Design a protein with these regions (language model features):
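Catalytic micro-motifs at enzyme active sites that drive phosphoryl/nucleotidyl and oxygen chemistry
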Residues: 21, 42-46, 65-67, 84-90, ...
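Short beta-strand micro-motifs enriched in acidic
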Residues: 49-50, 106, 221
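A generic structural signal for beta-strand entry/edge sites
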Residues: 52-58, 76, 140-142, 213-215
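A general structural signal for short secondary-structure junctions and capping/turn motifs
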Residues: 24-26, 69-71, 89-90, 133-137, ...
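An N-terminal domain-cap segment
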Residues: 2-70
Length: 260
């Protein structure tokens, strides 16, 4: 990841805690890969978390990881998550998380609730008929990961979390809409973004990189040969926001101040 800078000293900037950042990455927007000993790893078709942050993973019933659970209550596994910026940029990976724990199949009595939870983030047709069978076998199932340890690494730094700290946090309120907001800013307001930055930042192209309730990350670069590499700048909001109404209000203030 490019180096990160802020428009204030890091000590005075409010931002999400490591646990909140981990919960945001695990929410299900970022892609995940499931890794277990002796099992070929593969991308997870869809995943999300329940209210306590427990990952719920949709997999084919004949997938190697599902076969590894045959006759077992659970198996050790790690969910690896890579957070990629929705705006097309070089070096788009914004952060990573690793959730280590014990993987098991969701009991039949809890399968419907888990499918509904998954459908909020991923409205896939497979979730409508999880009980459907072909040749006497279920085609899809949902697995749950009980986290024993969580690691997160991003522009804020790296941290290792206990499961209680992770479960007590909440994902960012804009996790489900961030991609749409950033792509809109990039397509409709890219020319205005440089005016949001302080004069200390060298002039050059600016693209939206990240959004959370405390502020934005902007990807900055200067025309060559002045800056051979890009760098990221944190633009903090005056106060945290919790909904789209508050976000629109903050944006109006930012762009009003930036208008020449």
């Amino acid at each position: 990841m490019p180096r990160a800078e802020t428009t204030q000293s890091r000590q005075t900037i409010q931002g999400p805690t490591a646990a909140e950042r981990a919960r945001t990455l695990a929410y299900g927007v970022a892609d995940g890969v499931l890794v277990a000993p002796g099992v070929p790893y593969a991308p997870v078709p869809a995943h999300t978390t329940d209210r306590d942050g427990r990952p719920l993973l949709l997999v084919r019933a004949d997938a190697p990881i599902a076969a590894a659970l045959a006759g077992e209550d659970d198996v050790p596994a790690t969910l690896r998550i890579s957070d990629v910026a929705p705006v097309p940029l070089p070096d788009r990976v914004r952060g990573r998380a690793w959730l280590h724990g014990w993987l098991s199949e969701v009991p039949d009595g809890e399968m419907r609730a888990a499918a509904l939870r998954l459908s909020h983030a991923h409205p896939r047709p497979e979730l409508l008929d999880l009980g459907a069978e072909r040749d006497g076998r279920r085609e899809w199932t949902i697995l749950a990961l009980e986290a024993a340890q969580v690691e997160v690494e991003d522009a804020w730094g790296s941290a290792t979390l206990e499961p209680e700290e992770y479960a007590a946090a909440a994902p960012d309120p804009f996790v489900a809409v961030e991609a749409g907001v950033l792509t809109h800013l990039d397509s409709a307001h890219r020319g205005e973004l440089p005016r949001l930055l302080p004069r200390s930042v060298p002039p050059g192209p600016v693209r939206p990189l990240g959004l959370d309730r405390y502020g934005m990350w902007l990807r900055c670069s200067a025309p060559p040969p002045d800056a051979p590499s890009s760098f990221d700048v944190r633009l903090p909001f005056a106060e945290p926001v919790s909904d789209l109404h508050g976000l629109r209000r903050v944006y109006r203030r930012l762009f009003a101040r930036a208008t020449p």
